[in-house]
Amino acid sequence: MILCISQDNSPTEVVMSIVTISHAPYSGGSEIAEKIASVLNYRCVDREVLIEASRRYGIPEAKYAEILEAEGHWWERWMESLRLYRITLQAAMCEVAQEGPLIYYGRAGQELFPGISHVLKVLIVAPMEYRMQEVKSQKGLDGENAKHFLRELDRVRSRRMRALFNTEWQDPVGYDLVINSSRIATDSAAHLISQTVQREEFRPTAESEKTFQDLRTTARVQAALITSPKTRNIILNVRSDGGQVHISGILADPDLEKEIVRIAKDVVGVTDVMTDIEPPPIEYMHP
C-alpha cells in the first residue's frame, strides 16, 4: 500500500495488486517470482514475512519456519496449537502487503488473502522427472534418492498445509493460474503472470481495497487477542467492517469481555467494538 495526496491535501491509501506464487519444491518457482518482480518493479518477499511476524509478536522466526516446513506432531491436527502461528502469520502478511505491490513466494500465500480480488494466486508445477533433474543439479542426488527426497518434501508440506488451513495446497481450484515450468520457460512464465496481474480482473477496486482493509484490521485484532495472556486461549469470531469490529463467541468468564473490548479498541484501525458474547451451555458448566 502507498500513500497518495488527494485534491484536498489529505493522505489516502492506495492498494496495489499482489501476486502469490505457490510452487512445488525444485520447480523453479523462486526464479519465476524474482523475474516477475524485476519485470513489474514489485517487491519480492519470502522470509521477510516471517521476520515481520517475529518482530511484531515475539515468536522466533525459526518457529514459524518449523511450523511451515517441518514434520508436524500428531496432536497438532486436533489441538488448536497451530492457531497462534496461523493468525499472527496472516497479520504480518497484511502489514507487509500494505507497504506496496509485491510478489510473495513463501509458504501458504494462497491462503493468507481470502476474498481479495486484486490478489493473483499462481501455482507452479512440474513433473517429477523435471524436478529430479533440478535436485541432481543442485544437491547431487539422482535416481531413487532424488525421487524419495522430493516425495518426502511433498508429503511434509501437504501435511502442514492441511493442519494449518485444512486445505490441499496442490489443488488447482485454489488458484487463478497454474503453470507447468517444464513446458514454459522462466521468462515466458514471468511475462504471462505479469500480463495477467495487470488485467482488469486483478486491478484494485474500491470494493477490493475495503475488503483488504477489513482483513487487515480483523487480522490485527485476532493477533492482539491471541498474544494477550488473558485471552490467548479463547476462541472468538472477529469481523471488521470499515473499522467497526464485531466480536462473538462463548465465554465462561463474563469479566473477560471488558478485557476483550479493551484489547480490540487499542488496535490501530479500530473505530468501534461490538460484542455478542454468550455463556457456555448449562450442561457444559455442570456435566
Functional labels for PLM-detected ranges:
Residues L50-E66, P127-M128, M132-V156:
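Long, charge-dense
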Residues I21-E34:
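Glycine-rich phosphate-binding P-loop
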Residues L102-Q138:
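ATP-dependent NMP and nucleoside kinases share a basic, alpha-helical "lid"
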Residues L50-Y104, L141:
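ATP-dependent small-molecule kinase phosphotransfer cores
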Residues G115, A126, Q133-S137, L153-D154, ...:
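N-terminal targeting leaders
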Residues V39-V45:
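Post-Walker A helix-loop "phosphate-sensing" segment adjacent to the P-loop in P-loop NTPases
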Residues M1-V15:
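Short, Lys/Arg-enriched N-terminal segments with co-localized hydrophobic residues
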